[in-house]
Design a protein with these regions (language model features):
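Pyridoxal 5′-phosphate
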Residues: 1-414
Length: 414
């Protein structure tokens, strides 16, 4: 098994790029340019090797066996929880809940905390730029409880209207659930300020960190949020696994979301008592391999350094905006002063799906569509955008290929 991520004193991203085998192949006869990182990041060889090692030599169920192999798997599984606690600077490893992803994490909070604490007329504040995963669960709970959804509007530049947000807050506000970085626009929202204002109003907060956790240092205690959610596959880990951070006192007051093995204390046909946090929220056989894979991904990202990653990606985004700005007819959707990873754009006479198809024929992978964010598409009066999303293993040559590909595609519509 290879050592955890190569440590490079002055980070050499050209060397790091070599650790991603998927990037070194051809698609449709062209070298692959992967610019769909907001949908899913790629996996370095270190993470793939760690998963392979687990499946070959450690595979066993956790928490339930006295034999050595089970104990070994359990140790690796629970070590992941501790690593993630440290990675996001949570106060207690028992505040880390393993889920199937960001969507599952939000549903857990909505159904466990929301169904317990919302009443008719209570208010949940979201933003106009939310991913559907941070809209639909709250709508479903609101329909059952009589709660009301309020929405923070977005300005023409793609930024939240914070003054409008302040006016939305009221004594009836029970939850403020906000995306940290927009997957459709790239906007970095001022979550620390949003959380502080919510707390002043007596509300609880949830931050959707799916697009922020791969791109910058996350300090939960500094942000001050009550809940924070993210997915493994956005940060070089396996799919089907995610994290819910929850403030321990809130988690301890919340009922279980699902029933089954491991989340119980005692079971009879008359009654069941539940396990302690975090296990009461982790019913059934957990995604053991995925947790170990994310643990390795955390080691990998930490070895590079999140500050170095943020610096590298900021330079690439600035370069992409500069080069794309020179393309006649291209219009950006979302031009916030603070943005990360995502560059979203349209052409008035070229549909995003047509552009994406032509780019794919040149080996360039981008995302087209509404990006599971239909409300923000309606806000900007567009049916879809083309989204190029950048990771630390991308380079200027990838951006140049994108620009060349767009100019080639334009020739079909002129």
């Amino acid at each position: 098994m290879q050592e955890t991520a190569t440590k490079i004193s002055a980070v050499d991203f050209d060397e790091i790029r070599k650790e991603f085998p998927v990037l070194h192949q051809e698609m449709n006869g062209h070298p692959l340019v992967y610019l769909d990182n907001a949908a899913s990041s790629q996996m370095p060889v270190q993470v793939a090797d760690r998963l392979d090692y687990y499946h070959r030599f450690e595979h066993s169920n956790v928490h339930r066996g006295i034999h050595t192999l089970s104990q070994r798997a359990t140790d690796s599984y629970e070590a992941a929880r501790k690593k993630i606690q440290v990675f996001i600077n949570a106060a207690d490893e028992n505040e880390i809940i393993f889920t199937s992803g960001t969507t599952d994490s939000i549903n857990l909070v909505a159904n466990s905390y929301g169904m317990t604490n919302f009443s008719k007329g209570d208010e949940v504040i979201l933003t106009e730029m939310e991913h559907h995963a941070n809209i639909v669960p709250w709508q479903m709970v609101a329909q059952k409880t009589g709660a009301i959804i309020k929405v923070i509007p977005v300005t023409d530049s793609g930024e939240l209207d914070i003054e409008a947000y302040k006016k939305l807050l009221s004594p009836r506000t029970k939850m403020v659930s906000v995306i940290h970085i927009s997957n459709a626009l790239g906007t970095i929202n001022p979550v620390k300020e949003i959380v502080a204002l919510a707390h002043e109003a007596g509300a609880v907060t949830l931050i959707d960190g799916a697009q922020s956790i791969p791109h910058q240092n996350i300090d939960i205690q500094d942000i001050g949020t009550d809940f924070y959610v993210f997915s493994s596959h956005k940060m070089c880990g396996p799919t089907g696994f995610g994290i819910l951070y929850g403030r321990k006192d809130l988690l301890e007051a919340m009922p279980p979301y699902r029933g089954g093995g491991d989340m119980i204390d005692k079971v009879s046909f008359e009654e069941t008592t539940y396990n302690v946090v975090p296990f009461r929220f982790e019913a059934g056989t957990p995604p053991i391999a995925a947790s170990i894979g994310l643990s390795e991904a955390v080691d990998y990202l930490s070895a590079i350094g999140m500050d170095a990653i943020e610096t590298q990606e900021t330079k690439l985004v600035e370069y992409a905006v500069q080069e794309l700005s020179a393309i006649n007819g291209l219009r950006f959707i979302g031009e916030a002063k603070k943005r990360a990873s995502v560059v979203s754009f349209v052409f008035d006479h070229i549909h995003a799906s047509d552009l994406g198809t032509i780019l794919d024929k040149q080996g360039i992978a981008v995302r087209t569509g509404h990006h599971c964010a239909q409300p923000i598409m309606r806000r900007f009066n567009v049916p879809a955008t083309t989204r190029a999303s950048i990771a630390f293993y991308n380079n200027k040559e990838d951006v140049d290929r994108l620009v060349e590909g767009i100019n080639y595609a334009k020739s079909f519509f002129e």
